[in-house]
Each structure stands twice: as structure tokens, then as C-alpha cells.
Amino acid sequence: MLVQDHDRAGGYWGAVYAFCAVKGLQVVIDGPVGCENLPVTSVLHYTDALPPHELPIVVTGLGESEMSEGTEASMSRAWKVLDPALPAVVVTGSIAEMIGGGVTPQGTNIQRFLPRTIDEDQWEAADRAMTWIFSEFGMTKGRMPPEAKRPEGAKPRVNILGPMYGVFNMASDLHEIRRLVEGIGAEVNMVMPLGAHLAEMRHLVNADANIVMYREFGRGLAEVLGKPYLQAPIGVESTTAFLRRLGEILGLDPEPFIEREKHSTLKPVWDLWRSVTQDFFGTANFGIVATETYARGIRNYLEGDLGLPCAFAVARKRGSKTDNEAVRGLIRQHRPLVLMGSINEKIYLAELKAGHGPQPSFIAASFPGAAIRRATGTPVMGYAGATWLLQEVCNALFDALFHILPLGTEMDSAAATPTTLRRDFPWDADAQAALDRIVEEHPVLTRISAARALRDAAEKAALDAGAERVVRETVEALRGPGFGERKGENQ
């Protein structure tokens, strides 16, 4: 491909999204005019539904003169727009980094953070930014703040680390993790960075345990805080193990809550498992391309807990680039009945629509892409997430079945069935074998309709060419690019 498909932003984006989520902190972006338009004004509208100018951000607006004279003067001008009584942090873009920008002028309360956007990705910088916020505004000269003793009889306290802007489905997952914590009898001490105030950073040490919501970032701060920490769970079994371990750390009994959840939040899981869709679970394969948090968790739940066959699972990991061309090939080879991913995978899936048979269903599970999830009813984590995810998979299976039905408008516009097709039209053995291989790539649920459509198309192509029999080359031409490639191992 001539243009590389990106699946994450640079370090500058991650730092900005972390800093802007904290109350009481102003952000100066040291970059050219308009450098905030894409990450802040534009993208956050399509991911977090934030209106323009919602966040306390100002830009230095670098021009040609700053290339040789430095950025201190432009930074002083930008700082005067902000509230001088509030702390501010300057975040350097790639251009400012290349010319040695980000130097804070005298007489201002601006502190400097270097995102290293040239060599760090969004999640690496976000992880450092979270740790930096605590070390600069929670510690005193590098010393940990004193921990406030929990009053006798008070509930154990838990921090939730990771929620910030630009994270897929953050609101729903945060709501569910908070519900689980409170459900077993604990209370949330702080959510950081989203919604936390700069003046409260020292209170992070008051928690008895920490929950890191994402594998991509947040663990660095959890290590600094020095308290036991757990990864937020996805799936029924993982959530149960998570609650029991959290209860053990906090000295609480989670079993009454787990028992109540089985008869309430998790009831739809058992109902869906025993309903008519159970016939599809063993044959309806799925593929997922998402952050490591979602890719690992969702695959473990659907494949491990429920037994759905996984065609492939590709995790986007911090610090390493995803081979999107390989992902494209996996989608083409396996044609999963349900595909979860970002706009990249949605485009790759759309490229297959010229093929035969029903179209796979797509479920948004990752950025990049326009997907606003401000409502709290679409979790993937926790018990509620297990229910919602299985519900969406079942709906996706129904949608795949819908595509089998012929539309009246399509039937009217389609060419009439050729009367010259012969049911006894001879096929070469290797042509039949090629057809079988193509059909095997379709999910079991849709193989019958795909086989019929492919057979009719092959015989029509042979008749149109004046052939007396269907040969292998005719079938391969129907398959298009990628025919004959061996299926790769699941990632």
C-alpha cells in the first residue's frame, strides 16, 4: 500500500489527552498554527463528543521566525491568554522537539513535559504523563505524601487508573468498574486522570488498592504508588476471579455480590446461551483487531468462556507497530462471521463485499474511527460487559443471516437466471476441489448459500466462455486475489 494505515497517534496526542482530563491544569501546546485542530478540536468531537474550545488549551503558533529564534517569546504570549493563577504544562509537538522548543520562559508557572512524539506512541506518552502528574503535583520534592489513615468502620478505598480522553468506550467501562468496586462494599477513592483535580493528587496514596483499566498505560503510576493493583477484567470468569482477588486484598467478602449478579446482570448471558443462537456458537467464528486490553480480554471471553471459534486476534501493543497489511490478509483469508475492530478493519471488510455469500458483521471495538460512546450502557469490562458483548455478537449473527435473504429490488434488477445452465455440467476434479476450498473459508452458517452462488457463477462463466466443462482456472478467477494462500495460524 502506498499510504500506511495508522492505528494509534503519536506521543503528543497521548500527553494532551491525559493532561486535559485533569481539572485545574492548563495546557500549552508548543507547535505550529492549527496543531491542536486535529487531536483536540476535531478528533475529540468524533470520539468523546466534546465541543470545540471545551478544554483549557492554547497554542504557541510557531512560524518561520521561531525556527531560528526559539519558542520562548511565543510561549509567553500564549501563557498570557491563560489564567496565571493556575498551573500550566507545555507539551511539545514534533516540530518543537526538532528545533529544541518547549523551553519555559522566566516569570511564568509553566512546567515542561516532553512527549517524545517522534519515537513514542500515544500510549507510551500517556503512561509517562500520568506518572509525571503525580510526581510533580502529588509528591513534595520527590517524597511520597503522607497517607491518611482510614477511619475505623470506613469502607476500603480503591483508585481507578487510566480513564482519559481518546480512549474507546471509556465511559461505559469506567461506570462498570466503579459498580463492581462499590458492589463488593468498597468505595472509589479517585479516578485518575479523568475528573481528578490537581490539588487532590496527593490523595492517591490513601487508596488500599489500585485498578489499572488498560494494559497500554497506567501501570507506571500503579508501580509508583506501591499498593497492590489489578488489571480491569473482561469476561465472566475473569471478573469473578478479579472480584475475589480484590476482596482478598481489601478484606471484603465478594461472594454475596457475585451471587446477586448471577441472578441479575448475568441472567441474559445464560438466557442467550440457551436460546436459539446456541446453535451458532460452535460454528460462528469471529476476528478481533483492537488494543491489547480488548483483544486479549474479548478473545478470552468469547473463545475461552463461551467456546466461539476465534479466526484471529491481533493486539495493538504499546511501543510496537501493527502490520496492517497482514491484518488485511487475515480478514481476506478467514472471512470471520463477526469482525471487531476499528475503521481500518471496517474498510478492509468493505473490500470483500464483491465476493459471494452473506457479508460478515462488523462491531466497533477500537479507535481510530468515529464512534461516540459517552452513554454508560455499552461496557465490555465486568459482568455487564459480558452480557452486552454476547448480546452484540448474537445481534451480529442475526444481521449475517439477514444478508442471506434476497431483496426484492435486487431480484428485479438482477439478470435472469440463465436457462442454459445445466445441472449435469461437467466439472474437473481440481475445479471441484478449488470450489470446496473457497467454501471452507466461509463460516459454517453461510456455506450452503455461498456454495450455490459460487457453483452457478462458475458454470455461467464457463458457458459464456464457450467451454464444455468447468476447469480450475474458472473457479480461481471467481475467488480473486489471495486464492491458494494457506490460512495463517491464529495470532
Swiss-Prot record:
Chlorophyllide reductase is composed of three subunits; BchX, BchY and BchZ. Forms a heterodimer of one BchY and one BchZ subunit. Converts chlorophylls (Chl) into bacteriochlorophylls (BChl) by reducing ring B of the tetrapyrrole. NCBIfam families: BchZ. It catalyses: 3-deacetyl-3-vinylbacteriochlorophyllide a + 2 oxidized [2Fe-2S]-[ferredoxin] + ADP + phosphate = chlorophyllide a + 2 reduced [2Fe-2S]-[ferredoxin] + ATP + H2O + H(+); bacteriochlorophyllide a + 2 oxidized [2Fe-2S]-[ferredoxin] + ADP + phosphate = 3-acetyl-3-devinylchlorophyllide a + 2 reduced [2Fe-2S]-[ferredoxin] + ATP + H2O + H(+); 3-deacetyl-3-(1-hydroxyethyl)bacteriochlorophyllide a + 2 oxidized [2Fe-2S]-[ferredoxin] + ADP + phosphate = 3-devinyl-3-(1-hydroxyethyl)chlorophyllide a + 2 reduced [2Fe-2S]-[ferredoxin] + ATP + H2O + H(+). Its EC number is 1.3.7.15. One of its GO terms (molecular function) is oxidoreductase activity, acting on iron-sulfur proteins as donors. Pathway: Porphyrin-containing compound metabolism; bacteriochlorophyll biosynthesis. The keyword Oxidoreductase applies. Keywords: Bacteriochlorophyll biosynthesis, Chlorophyll biosynthesis, Oxidoreductase, Photosynthesis. Belongs to the ChlB/BchB/BchZ family. This is Chlorophyllide reductase subunit Z. It comes from Cereibacter sphaeroides (strain ATCC 17023 / DSM 158 / JCM 6121 / CCUG 31486 / LMG 2827 / NBRC 12203 / NCIMB 8253 / ATH 2.4.1.) (Rhodobacter sphaeroides). Pfam families: Oxidored_nitro, PCP_red. One of its GO terms (biological process) is photosynthesis.
